[in-house]
């Protein structure tokens, strides 16, 4: 078994000298205009690799993690079918709630991308739903705190139902103006529907909404 490579940075390269590395010497707007060479000096390269590149491209798994991932791929078609069925049922329920402002899920006929989803994903779309709850950030926090089955997690596609508040988690580094530009309001919630019985998931979502 071979590794995919290792980053070793001595910290001795001058990224500013030639003017050929603007990614290090110019502001990074995704992190409030930070200039890596100015803020981190000799650690500019390794910090950028950690903060930006890993964020954009994902982490690098160990050999054992890759082995486990490969095992999981063997049952992926079966799991995806259930993910999609559960998510569709939850999305349809959310769409009928008077406490929800909007629901984004390509499996819904009302979604702007439904036709494309039917064309390219005829066997099901995905297990991730985003919806905006009335009352903004305070209501979103109350809803998430009231969930009993779902877990607050940053990842998706778990066998467990997971929920996340993007504005205070994955996109917390953005300003209010940037959040608006990205279509992320304070009431937006991301729900990754799991493989629990759909009735249990629906019951949990309903009781949490009732407590908002």
Q: What is each model feature region?
A:
Residues 1-128, 132-162, 167:
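Active-site C-terminal subdomain of aminotransferase-like
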Residues 79, 145, 161-212:
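PLP-dependent enzyme catalytic core of the Aspartate aminotransferase-like
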């Amino acid at each position: 078994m071979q590794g995919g490579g290792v980053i070793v940075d001595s910290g001795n390269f001058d990224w500013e000298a030639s003017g050929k590395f603007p990614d290090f010497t110019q502001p990074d707007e995704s992190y409030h205009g930070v200039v890596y060479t100015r803020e981190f000096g000799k650690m500019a390269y390794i910090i950028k690799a950690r903060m930006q590149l890993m964020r954009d491209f994902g982490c690098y798994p160990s050999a054992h993690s890759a082995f486990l991932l490969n095992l999981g791929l063997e049952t992926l078609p079966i799991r995806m079918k259930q993910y999609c069925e559960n998510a569709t049922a939850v999305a349809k329920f959310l769409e009928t709630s008077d406490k929800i402002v909007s629901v984004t899920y390509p499996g819904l006929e009302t979604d702007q991308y439904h036709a494309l989803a039917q064309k390219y994903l005829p066997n099901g779309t995905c297990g991730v739903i985003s919806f905006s709850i009335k009352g903004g950030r305070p209501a979103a926090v109350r809803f998430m705190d009231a969930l009993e089955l779902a877990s607050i997690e940053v990842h998706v596609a778990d066998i467990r139902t997971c929920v996340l508040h993007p504005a205070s988690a994955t996109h917390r580094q953005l300003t209010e103006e940037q959040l608006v530009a990205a279509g992320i309001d304070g009431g937006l919630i991301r729900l990754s529907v799991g493989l629990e019985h759909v009735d249990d998931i629906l019951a949990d979502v309903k009781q949490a909404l009732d407590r908002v």
